[in-house]
Amino acid sequence: MTVASSNTTADEFLSGKLLIKQPRNGYRAGIDPVLLAASVNAKAKQTVLELGCGVGVASLCLGYRVPDLHLTGLEIQPALAQLAMENAQYNNIQMDVVTGDLAVLPQGLKSCQFDHVIANPPYF
């Protein structure tokens, strides 16, 4: 992963345990997704769906804390979904990222069941 570009920054989360590439402008992840991840009582082997995963911070923080989760992120913006995939790969955390709209759930997710479903809606 290229650490940063003119359009992105590389930011540390969990005291530097995760390096996350995110857009330089617009919504930027901060402490909220970290706290969201900390609030999920997930256990190894469970499944987690993050709605509107953005660049993947909440899921990746959760995946770091609880190894061996099956993480899936749903993101409507293709550029953010791509960054989420890159962030998962760079941080060695298995995460499937689906580009799609919650209002029109992608076919592959319609038949899935999850132990936990999380969301961290942005606010401005």
Q: Which residue stretches match the model-derived regions?
A:
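Class I SAM-dependent transferase core
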Residues: T2-K43
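Conserved SAM/SAH cofactor-binding pocket of Class I
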Residues: S39-F124
